């Protein structure tokens, strides 16, 4: 037998997955912020194997970039084997073994559509396989309804003698509730030898990987099973219903992990957390919150309710309420929301504020600066301790190009100020309400752009006679005359 202390992993991801009814290859559908295939590859990488081989075939032009993207993030080599025609799992492993020429050790075979399988379970399988000399160890599970799964057939001593697929089983065999998960640990030398002896004499007319067990046993090699503790880990995803079910189980796992690590999640059923999100201690997450991508929440933050954060960095003690944010950073002790939209490239400094109905895009807000109400701030830099008045607009687009606005420190702008970029407002400057700033404002200046107010008496009664406004004006004038 081979050296049991080295390992390689084969991940099968060549199938068509027609039940998904999708233009996307099955294993590229996502739960928890990762594709099904990425989950499987990361679980495999957790074994620290010498190599991972992903077997791809159907729509491989879609799948190969995903394999390459995962390979760039893990500490082991991942290569690709092509299965030109999908002729069964045995044929898929034959294709993969060309990438493992000369390898001697344990070969783990798993699938690209089992996103809930943990590295720890794979490690337990390998440990069980290598504890004593074994040709094959199959990872099994017990199901109350085993329909569709290959049944584990044992002899009187409890040894595995065969795996019988659903379509090939007789009535007695189909009563067995212990089933094949599709995950195996093989001795590399015995696997290589047995693959050459497979035939397609079965209901599907394919090469079954499971027949390797019968071949190995016939040749006198031991075949064993290791039963998984949680059958949900081994649930395959074949359609959209199963995709949603797996996503819910994964999210429950991630939410519970966050709570066990010191976060308070007020309503776990309405909180969704992606696999690469990090959450600190004493964070409070209110209902209907989604933390997506590589979002990072530092200690003592309050997030939600009704908040979606994607690839956001939230520093300690920040409060983010009813906000949608993407690819940005919120500083320590900052206050965001409610109803705030944060677009990529925005940085809010320590003690900063983006208030109700504020949209920020590619904006750097300095320490202690506030944008409290009803404002669009795009392509802008704001210094420290400045205040942007309500209903202000940073007019950054001329129809062709985007332009930058620079606001200094300790600036106070009146409500309804328009900043026509490119423009700079110096430190300590003020603007009057309704000002349209088209030119640079010196430090310490007060800028106003409106002319003297004119009141045209009687205009409404003269130009809008018979309207409610004219009637109200006439009554007001009559009241003034009576009191006068």
UniProtKB/Swiss-Prot annotation:
Q: Where is this region: Linker?
A: 241-261
Residues recorded as binding acetyl-CoA, renumbered to this chain, are 390, 396-397, 415, 433
Q: What is its main location?
A: cytoplasm
Top-tier EC class: transferase
Q: What is its EC number?
A: 2.7.7.23, 2.3.1.157
Region (Pyrophosphorylase) location: 1-240
Among PANTHER family, the record links this protein to: BIFUNCTIONAL PROTEIN GLMU, NUCLEOTIDYL TRANSFERASE
- Family membership noted in the UniProt record: In the N-terminal section; belongs to the N-acetylglucosamine-1-phosphate uridyltransferase family. In the C-terminal section; belongs to the transferase hexapeptide repeat family.
Q: Kindly provide the name given to this protein in its UniProt entry.
A: Bifunctional protein GlmU
Q: Which organism is it from?
A: Corynebacterium diphtheriae (strain ATCC 700971 / NCTC 13129 / Biotype gravis)
The organism that produces this protein has a lineage beginning with: Bacteria, Bacillati, Actinomycetota, Actinomycetes, Mycobacteriales
């Amino acid at each position: 037998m081979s050296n049991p202390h080295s390992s390689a992993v084969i991940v099968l991801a060549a199938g068509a997955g027609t039940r998904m009814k999708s233009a996307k290859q099955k294993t590229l559908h996502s739960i928890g912020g990762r594709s099904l295939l990425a989950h499987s590859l990361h679980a495999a990488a957790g074994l620290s194997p010498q190599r991972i081989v992903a077997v791809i075939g159907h729509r491989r032009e879609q799948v190969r970039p995903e394999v390459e993207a995962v390979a760039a993030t893990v500490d082991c080599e991942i290569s690709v084997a092509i299965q030109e025609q999908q002729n069964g799992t045995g044929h898929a492993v034959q294709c993969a073994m060309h990438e493992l020429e000369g390898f001697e050790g344990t070969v783990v075979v798993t699938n690209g559509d089992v996103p809930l399988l943990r590295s720890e379970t794979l490690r337990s399988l390998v440990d069980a396989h290598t504890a004593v000399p074994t040709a094959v160890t199959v990872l099994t599970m017990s199901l109350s309804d085993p329909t569709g799964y290959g049944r584990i057939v044992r002899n009187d001593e409890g040894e595995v003698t065969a795996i019988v697929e659903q379509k090939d089983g007789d009535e007695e065999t189909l009563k067995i509730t212990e089933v094949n998960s599709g995950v195996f640990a093989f001795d590399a030398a015995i696997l290589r030898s047995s693959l050459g002896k497979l035939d397609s004499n079965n209901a599907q007319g394919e090469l079954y990987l499971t027949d390797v067990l019968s071949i190995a046993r016939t040749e006198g090699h031991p075949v064993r099973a290791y039963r998984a503790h949680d059958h949900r880990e081994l649930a395959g995803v074949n359609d959209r219903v199963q995709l949603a079910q797996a996503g819910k189980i994964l999210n429950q796992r991630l939410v519970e992990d966050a709570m066990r690590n010191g976060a308070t999640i007020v309503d776990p059923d309405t909180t969704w957390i992606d696999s690469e999100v990090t959450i600190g201690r004493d964070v409070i997450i209110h209902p209907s919150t989604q933390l997506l991508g590589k979002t990072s929440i530092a200690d003592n933050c309050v997030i939600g309710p009704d908040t979606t954060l994607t690839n956001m960095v939230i520093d300690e003690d920040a409060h983010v309420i009813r906000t949608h944010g993407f690819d940005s950073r919120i500083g320590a002790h900052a206050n965001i929301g409610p109803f705030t939209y944060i677009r990529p490239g925005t940085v809010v400094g320590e003690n900063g504020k983006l208030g109700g109905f504020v949209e920020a895009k590619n904006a750097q807000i300095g320490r202690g600066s506030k944008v409290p109400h009803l404002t669009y701030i795009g392509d802008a830099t704001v210094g420290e301790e400045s205040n942007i008045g309500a209903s202000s607009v940073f007019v950054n687009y001329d129809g062709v190009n985007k332009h930058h606005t620079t606001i200094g420190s300790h600036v106070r702008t009146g409500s309804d100020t328009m900043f026509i970029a490119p423009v700079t407002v110096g430190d300590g400057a003020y603007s009057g309400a309704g000002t349209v700033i088209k030119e640079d404002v010196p430090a310490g200046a007060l800028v106003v752009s409106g002319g003297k107010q004119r009141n045209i008496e009687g205009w409404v009664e003269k130009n809008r006679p018979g309207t409610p406004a004219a009637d109200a004006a006439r009554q007001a004038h009559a009241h003034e005359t009576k009191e006068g």
